[in-house]
C-alpha cells in the first residue's frame, strides 16, 4: 500500500500554491462544533439514502476541468492529466451544471431558544445547512454561500470554508438574502424563521425566482413560537426592533396569536408554491434528521420533475 504521509511542498515550487495550501491547513486545523454535529447527522442519513447520480450517463457525457485545491485527490483523472503539465478532474456534464447556494438567516429573531433543551434557531439552521451541504458535496456537487462574494466550489475544503463562515455570524446580519445572478440550473436553500413582513419575503422570493433559481425554503420554528405556552403575567421582547410588550394574562391572547402565526406561515408557503419552490417547516424540538431527509428528498424530487 502506498504511503499517505504528508510531504511538504518543495520550496522551488511556484508561490501560487502557498495561499491555497495555507488556507486548507487553517480550515482543517479546527472544525467548528456545529460542523461536527452536522457531520454526525449526515453520516446517519447518508447510510439510508441512495446517491443521486443520474442513471444512463456513459463515457460520452464526461467532461474535464482543471484541478482545484478544494477537490478530492480521488477525483483526478490521471490518464487525462498525463497528457498535460496540469491536473484534471473528470465530471459528468449534469454534475458540472449543478450548484446549490445557501442562505442561512442569523438575524436577531433567529437567536432565540425558549428551552435549554433546544438549540437557538440559528444554530439548528446552521446544522441543517451544513448537513445538506455535506450530502451534496459527497455527491460531487458545488456549494456556495450567498453574500460572501466567493464562487461556489466542491469538496471537503468547500464544506469547511462554509462552516467557518456560518459559525461566526455578524451581529447585525441581514434577515433577507441578497440579489442573486446565477445560471438557470442553480438551486437555492433559504433557511430562516420567516418572521419578516410578508411583503418583504414575497419581494425577495420573486427576485430570486426571476433570476432563474429553483429554491427550497426551510422554516425554523421554536416550540414556544408555535404553541404559545405562556400563562399569567408575561413580558415579551422583540430583539429585532427592541420593543417590549407586557401581558397581564398571556393565555387570553393564545388563540388569536396562533391564528396569526399559522396564517403568516401559510402565506410564506403559498408564496413559495406559486413560484414552484418547496416549503418545509421544522421545529427545534424535533429531530434534525427528519428535516434533513425531507429536504434532501425534496431536492431529488424537484430535480426529477425538471428532468435533471
Regions inferred by a protein language model and the residue ranges of each:
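Exposed, interaction-prone extracellular/peripheral surfaces
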Residues: 2-56, 65-74, 80-85, 89-308
Amino acid at each position: 500500500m502506498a504511503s499517505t504521509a504528508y510531504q511538504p511542498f518543495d520550496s522551488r515550487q511556484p508561490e501560487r500554491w502557498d495561499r491555497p495550501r495555507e488556507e486548507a491547513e487553517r480550515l482543517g486545523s479546527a472544525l467548528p462544533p456545529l460542523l461536527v454535529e452536522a457531520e454526525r447527522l449526515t453520516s446517519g442519513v447518508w447510510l439510508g439514502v441512495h446517491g443521486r447520480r443520474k442513471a444512463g450517463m456513459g463515457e460520452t457525457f464526461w467532461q474535464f476541468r482543471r484541478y482545484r485545491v478544494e477537490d478530492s485527490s480521488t477525483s483526478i483523472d490521471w490518464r487525462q492529466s498525463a497528457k498535460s503539465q496540469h491536473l484534471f478532474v473528470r465530471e459528468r456534464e449534469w454534475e458540472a451544471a449543478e450548484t446549490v447556494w445557501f442562505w442561512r438567516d442569523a438575524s436577531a429573531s433567529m437567536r432565540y431558544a425558549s428551552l435549554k433543551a433546544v438549540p437557538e434557531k440559528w444554530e439548528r439552521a446552521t446544522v441543517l445547512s451544513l448537513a445538506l451541504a455535506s450530502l451534496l458535496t459527497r455527491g460531487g456537487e458545488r456549494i456556495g454561500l450567498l453574500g460572501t462574494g466567493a464562487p461556489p466550489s466542491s469538496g471537503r475544503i468547500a464544506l469547511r470554508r462554509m462552516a467557518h463562515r456560518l459559525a461566526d455570524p455578524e451581529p447585525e446580519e441581514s434577515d433577507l438574502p441578497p440579489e442573486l445572478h446565477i445560471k438557470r440550473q442553480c438551486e437555492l436553500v433559504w433557511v430562516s424563521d420567516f418572521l419578516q413582513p410578508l411583503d418583504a419575503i414575497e419581494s425577495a422570493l420573486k427576485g430570486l425566482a426571476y433570476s432563474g433559481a429553483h429554491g427550497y425554503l426551510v422554516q425554523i420554528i421554536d416550540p414556544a413560537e408555535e404553541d404559545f405556552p405562556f400563562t399569567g403575567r408575561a413580558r415579551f421582547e422583540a430583539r429585532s426592533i427592541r420593543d417590549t410588550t407586557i401581558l397581564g394574562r398571556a393565555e387570553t391572547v393564545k388563540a388569536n396569536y396562533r391564528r396569526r402565526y399559522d396564517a403568516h406561515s401559510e402565506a410564506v408557503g403559498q408564496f413559495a408554491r406559486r413560484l414552484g419552490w418547496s416549503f418545509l417547516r421544522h421545529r427545534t424540538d424535533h429531530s434534525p434528521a427528519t428535516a434533513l431527509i425531507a429536504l434532501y428528498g425534496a431536492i431529488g424530487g424537484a430535480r426529477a420533475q425538471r428532468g435533471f
